[in-house]
């Protein structure tokens, strides 16, 4: 029976079925990093590689306890790189990226799709800062200047993590006055970047 046929039986001679492409998957390669400079190197190489990552972030050691995943077995600072696509393509590209970065198996962990999604949702939502009551800033600089900027502002007792493959520094500072904020702005300006106050 067809709609509007008033009970008349009909024969379908041709049927067109519209299908949607299968939803892509993702995994996250997590690398144990002892040094910020090495982490920035990994981010830079990853974003310019043929593995085509869709996310690249670095968390210092002080935020390590914010992530408790079954698949995350490493300690200390972490660099996380997300790869999206078909399952077979993802695994191949992660292997290729590990070879390009020259990292060993005992230095990495792989977050499977479900845990990978949670990790990146927490990153987008700035969850590591959710229980902190300090001032929150968004710093954007060329990736080549990130290390220098962090070296100069660390005297302000900053808590931070790095997103956008090295160009975005989310920064939390407990106590800051007008003089300190002006100095930080000047440091960032000299690094060809800018600062946005999110909460103060």
State each model region's role.
Residues 1-52, 56-57, 83:
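FAD-binding subdomain of flavoenzyme oxidoreductases
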Residues 1-20, 64, 87-133:
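Extended, compositionally biased intrinsically disordered regions at domain boundaries
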Residues 2, 38-46, 90-93, 97, ...:
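Hydrophobic side chains in well-ordered alpha-helices
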Residues 9-10, 27-29, 53-56, 78-80, ...:
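Structural motif
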Residues 15-23, 58-77, 121-132, 157-163:
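Short, flexible, solvent-exposed loop/turn segments with mixed acidic/basic and small polar residues
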Residues 31-35, 81-87, 139-143, 171-176:
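Short beta-strand-to-loop capping motifs
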Residues 32-33, 41-111:
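A conserved active-site cap/scaffold subdomain adjacent to cofactor or substrate pockets
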Residues 104-200:
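Conserved glycine-rich FAD pyrophosphate-binding loop
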